[in-house]
């Protein structure tokens, strides 16, 4: 989701940009319509443009969520051609049984949806999430506005890779923060040519 759903608090610093009440089950079909993925990307680009108008000189893209290492691993598999085993980590500390299930779900999602690794929008709409779409848009928007943007974490680096596949020149504005403990991080960072500054053992 791109908003805090049913929050009892009014907080002007939080920008709610809902694309719907969650994505669909990627193990059964596409996560969202292609036009919804495009809308998410454009929303992120708009946020970056607004930041520039507000006088912001550097952006940072991170995330807070549960379950989004699953979609990020699926997206990275599609973009990189790497096997599920190579890019999938335990996320929030899964048990062995849950970790096995996670990998099976990703395998099934890729088999059912057959995302085109040469088309990042196809990948995002089939096996991505609203968060990844918006984050990719922020990366693209930052580059368009010539703003440096910090890439923070696994989900962020996968979104950055989507952005760079849409516009190769965008990667010149990306700054790596820390090396995520998630298995696929180094693969995505290598594909981006990103060199993170810190090793903190964080996911």
Task: Label every PLM stretch briefly.
Residues 2-4:
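Short, small-residue-biased leader/transition segments that mark boundaries at the very start
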Residues 7-49, 106-121, 125-126:
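Small/polar-residue-rich loop-to-helix segments that shape phosphate-bearing ligand pockets
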Residues 19-68, 74-83, 91-95:
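Glycine-rich, mobile lid/loop segments that gate access to catalytic sites or pores
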Residues 42, 46-53, 78-85, 104-115, ...:
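Generic secondary-structure signature for well-ordered alpha-helical cores
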Residues 59, 70-134:
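Phosphate/pyrophosphate-binding betaalpha-module
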Residues 61-64, 68, 130-165:
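Glycine-rich phosphate-binding loop
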Residues 87-92, 171-176, 196-203:
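Short beta-alpha connecting loops at secondary-structure transitions
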Residues 182-203:
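Internal helix-turn-beta structural module
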